[in-house]
């Protein structure tokens, strides 16, 4: 059976836990300290969705400001974009708008308002009893303003919603890939139909 490859990109500020989320999902492991992603890192994972084998190609990106201008080719052919912030750090949430707009600019999807994004508010376990900085309602409002983006609150350390989030990400990526395939097939068929349809002639 042919396996479908799906490209997924994780974007967000440095330190929000993108690498930890990916390690928890792929390796079922968590490390308190690990080396920061220098540029980009690729993880592949094979799963089954609706009796279809898919290979997730998940790109983990560095979050430093100097890496925000990744080349356009890096964004091309992405099937789902995951935006990650730290629920305890306001700046990382405020940066989500920039990451969202940068992706739209670089990837240039055919229908930007319908492209599948998923927002992840990470580190829900580390507020140490203090009130969290970014309330869930604020994140929900942001998602609504962008066309009802799906939102998950996660913790890589406590294993909260990580599997559920990546399953939804994979489903959205697969749906997007199918829609692109359908559009490409339609475009290849329409010119053929137009070419083969004889023009009507009026008899005088």
Swiss-Prot record:
Q: Which InterPro entries match?
A: P-loop_NTPase (IPR027417), Small_GTP-bd (IPR005225), Small_GTPase (IPR001806)
Q: Which UniProt keywords apply?
A: Cell membrane, GTP-binding, Lipoprotein, Membrane, Methylation, Nucleotide-binding, Prenylation, Protein transport, Transport
**Does the keyword section mention Secreted?**
no
Please report a single Pfam family linked to this protein: Ras
> Lipid link (S-geranylgeranyl cysteine) located at?
202, 204
Which SMART domains does the protein's record reference?
Answer: RAB, RAN, RAS, RHO
The disulfides recorded in the entry are none
Q: How does it sit in the membrane?
A: Lipid-anchor
Q: Where in the cell is it found?
A: Cell membrane
- Give me the residues that bind GTP, please: 12-19, 60-64, 122-125, 155-156
MF terms in GO: GTP binding; GTPase activity
Q: TM spans, by residue? A: none
What coarse category fits the chief subcellular location reported for this protein? membrane
**Database matches in Gene3D superfamilies:** P-loop containing nucleotide triphosphate hydrolases
Q: Which GO cellular component does the record give, naming just one?
A: plasma membrane
Q: Which domain of life is it from?
A: Eukaryota
Homology family: Belongs to the small GTPase superfamily. Rab family.
What is the recorded function of this protein according to its Swiss-Prot or TrEMBL entry?
Intracellular vesicle trafficking and protein transport.
Q: Would you tell me the protein name for this molecule?
A: Ras-related protein RABG1
What is the source species?
Arabidopsis thaliana (Mouse-ear cress)
Task: List the top taxonomic levels of the source.
Answer: Eukaryota, Viridiplantae, Streptophyta, Embryophyta, Tracheophyta
Q: Give the gene symbol.
A: RABG1
